[in-house]
């Protein structure tokens, strides 16, 4: 009887393996790929053509999936001059609705509490002046308000309780906290390491405010810890991950990295930090309990970009842009063993990436 039970359990595990699904945007090809990973092989199930103008590159940039998994959302960053937010059905991968946002809308996420979508307007090609976060009701696809933040905001992420939204301003080097309920900026933190600045050699009389705020950190991403009051920021210009204590609202640690950290994510179990090192085409994995860098995994091509981690904290899916006319590639990394398991080619300049679902 015991042997029969054992055989049945083994058979169940073999037959009912987990499948993982995610969406990845190819910014230079105006396509989005639906990928499936079966635990061994990563494959492209569908390539969806996006945008309205076949002769123009509209730049699919940011991706997110709503909490119930019924819809996915895409920002088209290139506009005339304003970009768009497009809503798609996960059942058909067809357009449901759209709305116009600000200049170069980029990363975004939906609050599980308010149901609103919070999208940064990166304003890549505009003047170096404060931009905004657009707040959208995804049910009606109506932009409710734009909240003024810093210069070139990026990395819109929301706390696990759905109450706070964070973004970083790349050119002004600031972390912004928005109250998801009141839709107002509640706190701003300067991320520069002022201990390294020689203030005695600064000529303040000839320096205006915008010059003083030009960032050496150049933060590009922010992620709150899933169950601790800690925020992690990718310092792309300073080659570091900045840890911020959200209770004291102070920098608590600066973790040196390889060159050009770009995106950073925390595993849902709170144990691991994953960061793309864009300038060297690698992905770093840290143990958060010890603070130790476990490994730098070389990606399959150049220019590492975005990260999506599976809800079971087993796998990190990494979009890698490639250079020139190369196809973009998505790598899947086993987090515990820090090994690259498989990859798949998609359209050119793989960028925005969002996990959809796990399925037996």
Regions found by a protein language model. Name each.
Residues 17-360:
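Predominantly soluble domains enriched in secretory-pathway, periplasmic, or organellar proteins
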Residues 2-13:
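Sec-dependent N-terminal signal peptides
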């Amino acid at each position: 009887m015991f042997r029969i039970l054992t055989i049945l359990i083994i058979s169940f595990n073999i037959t009912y393996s987990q499948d993982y699904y995610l969406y990845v945007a190819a910014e230079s090809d105006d396509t989005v790929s639906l990928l499936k990973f079966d635990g061994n092989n990563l494959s492209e199930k569908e390539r969806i053509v996006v945008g309205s103008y076949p002769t123009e590159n509209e730049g699919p940039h940011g991706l997110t999936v709503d909490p119930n998994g019924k819809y996915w959302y895409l920002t088209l960053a290139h506009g005339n001059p304003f970009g768009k937010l497009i809503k798609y059905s996960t059942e058909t991968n067809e357009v449901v609705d759209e709305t116009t946002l600000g200049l170069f809308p980029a990363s975004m996420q939906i609050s599980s509490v308010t149901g609103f979508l919070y999208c940064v307007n990166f304003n890549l090609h505009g003047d170096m002046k404060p931009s905004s976060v657009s707040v959208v009701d995804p049910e009606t696809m109506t932009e409710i308000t734009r909240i003024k933040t810093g210069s070139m905001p990026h990395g819109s992420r929301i706390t696990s309780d759905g109450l706070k939204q964070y973004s970083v301003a790349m050119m002004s080097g600031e972390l912004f906290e928005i109250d998801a309920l009141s839709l107002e900026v509640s706190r701003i933190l300067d991320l520069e390491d002022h201990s390294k600045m020689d203030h005695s050699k600064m000529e303040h009389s000839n320096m205006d405010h915008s010059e003083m705020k030009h960032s050496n950190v150049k933060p590009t991403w922010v992620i709150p810890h899933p169950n601790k009051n800690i925020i992690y920021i990718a310092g792309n210009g300073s080659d570091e991950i900045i840890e911020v204590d959200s209770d004291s609202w102070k920098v608590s640690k600066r973790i040196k990295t390889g060159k050009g950290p770009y995106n950073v994510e925390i595993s849902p179990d709170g144990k691991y930090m994953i960061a793309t090192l864009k300038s060297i085409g690698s992905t770093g994995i840290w143990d958060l309990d010890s603070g130790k860098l476990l490994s730098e995994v070389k990606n399959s091509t150049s220019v590492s970009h975005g990260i999506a981690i599976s809800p079971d904290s087993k796998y990190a899916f990494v979009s890698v842009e490639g250079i020139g006319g190369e196809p973009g590639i998505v790598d899947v990394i086993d987090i515990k063993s820090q090994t690259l398991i498989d990859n798949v080619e998609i359209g050119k300049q793989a960028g925005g990436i969002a996990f959809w679902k796990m399925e037996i």
